[in-house]
Amino acid sequence: MGRGGDSSGQAHPAAELAVPSDRAEVSNADSKALHIVLYGKRVDVTKFQRTHPGGSKVFRIFQDRDATEQFESYHSKRAIKMMEGMLKKSEDAPADTPLPSQSPMGKDFKAMIERHVAAGYYDPCPLDELFKLSLVLLPTFAGMYMLKAGVGSPLCGALMVSFGWYLDGWLAHDYLHHSVFKGSVARTVGWNNAAGYFLGFVQGYAVEWWRARHNTHHVCTNEDGSDPDIKTAPLLIYVRNKPSIAKRLNAFQRYQQYYYVPVMAILDLYWRLESIAYVAMRLPKMLPQALALVAHYAIVAWVFAGNYHLLPLVTVLRGFGTGITVFATHYGEDILDADQVRHMTLVEQTALTSRNISGGWLVNVLTGFISLQTEHHLFPMMPTGNLMTIQPEVRAFFKKHGLEYREGNLIECVRQNIRALAFEHLL
């Protein structure tokens, strides 16, 4: 399954970042010099603004900031080797530049990654991936067949489609992180991307829309002003025990801790509209993705003919399942400002901004392994089937370095989010 070639690193070369962003973000600011700090060197990345598959926004976020751990998280050893030439031409970072990657914790984290590589935890897991793929495609297409052919209960068919689309999102996420097919970069990047685009078509989301959001989220999780995933205003304002925020809530927002759970049901519809708008604003460049979306909705209209009344139920259930899971693992956690993060290792930032959903293997499968959010953010290129295996070592690592390993069952995680929204006790 794509074995051979460069399979020892966490990811793929710079030209094939796992989660590319939107090139349209590059504007007249192209001429501004951009420098990031890698391995203690101040590297000029200005010329990569238009060609960097991860987008130029990450360069601006990490301007004169240590990006070593983030760079290694999404690039292979081959790409790191390619960077050596630029490092030799680069000057040392200013003496006052924080270098968390060179701290004892940073070095310990790098050693842990190397142990995982040596143990084969980055190797592909074909049976796991086949199982997950079957959980997506079988209910989706079986449900569509039931609806179109009039076999069995239309409600049952609609529920199966909703369940398949729900799991489809998590599986597409894995492929687009390039954590499924491993081996020769030239082959497996294309295979992972092709699978991701196919799954995007099946569920009706544009891949480039997802990438534009997700790329930045991973490298600056819960960083105020940089992470697009935590921009939930005006619908939800996370107070997090701050009186200054509580006092600014309007009359509607003062009910947010009550409508938080129900509002998860509209997320699928919201994301679909956002995805369509994202593509529409980038035509004709994104014509292929626009045609894929048109084809998806044409097929849905054909399949659900005579049962259109079930479509709201499909999107409500899918949105609720996805939203309640995603929000449980990040949104109620710490929000960090850029100055704080400059001094943090990737592990420290992850410890403050991620929360796992406990419950074992079944919960992991039913949440697309996003329940292991901490491990996923530390090792985004690792096949999800191996995240449970390394969990005890990650716990021990956190304990060794005095970090809190945050987790709870789904109900506890939802309560954590509600507490972060509460405000009455601050007035």
UniProtKB/Swiss-Prot annotation:
Q: Which GO terms describe its biological process?
A: long-chain fatty acid biosynthetic process; unsaturated fatty acid biosynthetic process
Q: What is its EC number?
A: 1.14.19.-
Alphabetized SUPFAM superfamilies for the sequence: Cytochrome b5-like heme/steroid binding domain (SSF55856)
User: What GO cellular component term, any one, is given?
Assistant: membrane
**Residues that hold heme according to the record:** H52, H75
Q: Which residues form the Cytochrome b5 heme-binding domain?
A: 36-84
Q: Coiled-coil ranges per the record?
A: none
Q: Where is this region: Disordered?
A: 1-24
Q: Where in the cell is it found?
A: Membrane
At the top level, the lineage of the source is Eukaryota
Q: Which PANTHER family match?
A: DELTA(5) FATTY ACID DESATURASE C-RELATED (PTHR19353:SF19), FATTY ACID DESATURASE 2 (PTHR19353)
Q: What is this protein called?
A: Acyl-lipid 8-desaturase
Its lineage opens with: Eukaryota, Haptista, Haptophyta, Pavlovales, Pavlovaceae
